[in-house]
């Protein structure tokens, strides 16, 4: 552990400032696009599932729940994404695998719609001639803001913190997100610490505790989240409380 306060770890990260800022930019793009698409798809699936008059509603609800129990496996997924969709070393490597919607999020949003939006609103809108999509756009989405912000926060954190897809599908440094880049930095520092005579790094880095590097990298990775979260906290708390009333 560090024996005294120092900024050597941050200086090491700052030496790669251009790469770090490029990774930040790519991560922000992935997070914004991925979160927006996730919110649209999740709400479009949860909305009809919340309607009591949906034909076959029990089957579709069970179908969504069933996907929580099983996974297709890593190897089939890797073959599918790299051979059929050809996402290797592209921005889609961070987007498409994560856009396989979370059944938990769908159930959470569906439950919120069922328990927080009165049936009388649906009936009044239908009497006035509103289509189901109009109801979704003008009633469901505005009233569902707390749960949508909550799911958006979940999805945004997922896209921001994702490094496994970068590990599987990306080997070009120009396409590293901040998490993938910082993970590579940790691996480089660990290798240098384990083999101090085999690298060309400075003596300060060789003697620098890897814990210092890990903590500095963790702070750099989480800093944008710390800035954004206070503005979303009230929606997060209310969305979780209301969406989890009953399943």
Task: Give the ranges of each region predicted by the language model.
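A hydrophobic, multi-pass inner-membrane permease signature
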Residues: 1-247
């Amino acid at each position: 552990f560090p024996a005294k306060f120092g900024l050597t770890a941050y200086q090491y990260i700052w030496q790669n400032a251009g790469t770090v800022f490029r990774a930040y930019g790519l991560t922000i793009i992935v997070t914004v696009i991925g979160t927006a698409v996730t919110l649209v798809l999740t709400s479009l699936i949860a909305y009809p599932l919340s309607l009591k008059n949906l034909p076959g509603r029990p089957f579709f609800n069970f179908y969504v729940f069933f996907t929580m129990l099983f996974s297709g496996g890593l190897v089939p997924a890797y073959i599918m994404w790299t051979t059929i969709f050809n996402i290797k070393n592209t921005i889609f490597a961070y987007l498409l695998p994560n856009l396989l919607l979370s059944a938990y999020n769908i159930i959470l949003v569906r439950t919120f719609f069922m328990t927080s939006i009165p049936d009388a609103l649906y009936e009044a809108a239908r009497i006035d001639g509103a289509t189901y999509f109009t109801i979704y756009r003008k009633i469901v989405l505005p009233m569902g803001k707390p749960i949508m912000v909550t799911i958006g926060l979940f999805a945004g954190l997922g896209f921001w913190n994702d490094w496994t897809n970068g590990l599987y599908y990306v080997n070009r440094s120009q396409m590293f997100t901040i998490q993938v880049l910082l993970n590579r930095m940790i691996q480089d520092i660990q290798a240098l610490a384990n083999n101090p005579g085999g690298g060309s790094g400075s003596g300060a880095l060789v003697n620098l505790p890897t814990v210092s590097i890990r903590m500095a990298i963790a702070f750099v990775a989480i800093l944008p989240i710390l800035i954004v979260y206070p503005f979303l906290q009230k929606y997060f708390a209310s969305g979780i409380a209301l969406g989890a009333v009953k399943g």
